[in-house]
């Protein structure tokens, strides 16, 4: 009888997924204000400068940067990921975005990570901003930067239209990809 409940009841699985994700979320993280998002983005940028050697070169060379701090992923067979962040151009926030992705397969656990996408060309930035829901790998290819020994970033990717970093990962799921990540503009007021 127990086996039938676990194998046939998707509600149980969804409840467990929600429970795992909730364990990693601050109580108000799903309803952040613009001010709260900006504060989290500022902290993530400071972490980026501290953890990634050569970070300044990416910031200076980019036309804009999407900063998604504390993106949370939880999984128990079915996985989900969510986070909110800001697009900054010239050091100022111009728009707010969320990222959502889902997956099915053998997986269990949870993690939190920071994501920064650098738009290195005006065309890549324009296409991102015009999109209703921009998906990594579909609407634009992201060159994920590997951080070498001593925390130094490989700056040869500066010539790619979109460069991505996944850093400050904490948790039990070692996932540094952006596969399936969808970024959607939010309607947030100051």
Language-model features: where?
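Small-residue-enriched, tightly packed secondary-structure blocks
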Residues: 31-190
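Bacterial N-terminal signal peptides
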Residues: 13-26
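Bacterial N-terminal signal peptides that target proteins for export
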Residues: 2-15
């Amino acid at each position: 009888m127990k086996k039938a409940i676990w194998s046939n009841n998707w509600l149980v699985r969804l409840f467990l997924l929600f429970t795992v994700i909730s364990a990693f979320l601050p109580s108000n993280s799903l309803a952040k204000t613009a001010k709260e998002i900006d504060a989290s983005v500022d902290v993530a940028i400071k972490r980026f400068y501290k953890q990634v050697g050569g970070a300044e070169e990416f910031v200076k060379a980019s036309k804009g940067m999407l900063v998604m701090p504390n993106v949370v992923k939880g999984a128990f067979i079915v996985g989900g990921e969510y986070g909110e962040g800001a697009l900054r151009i010239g050091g100022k926030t111009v728009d707010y975005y969320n990222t959502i992705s889902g997956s099915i397969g053998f997986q269990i656990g949870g993690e939190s990570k920071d994501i920064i996408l650098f738009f290195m060309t005006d065309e890549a930035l324009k296409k991102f901003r015009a999109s209703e829901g921009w998906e990594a790998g579909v609407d634009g290819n992201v060159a994920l930067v590997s951080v070498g020994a001593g925390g130094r970033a490989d700056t040869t990717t500066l010539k790619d239209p979109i460069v991505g970093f996944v850093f400050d990962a904490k948790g039990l799921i070692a996932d540094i990809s952006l596969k399936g990540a969808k970024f959607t503009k939010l309607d947030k007021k100051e």
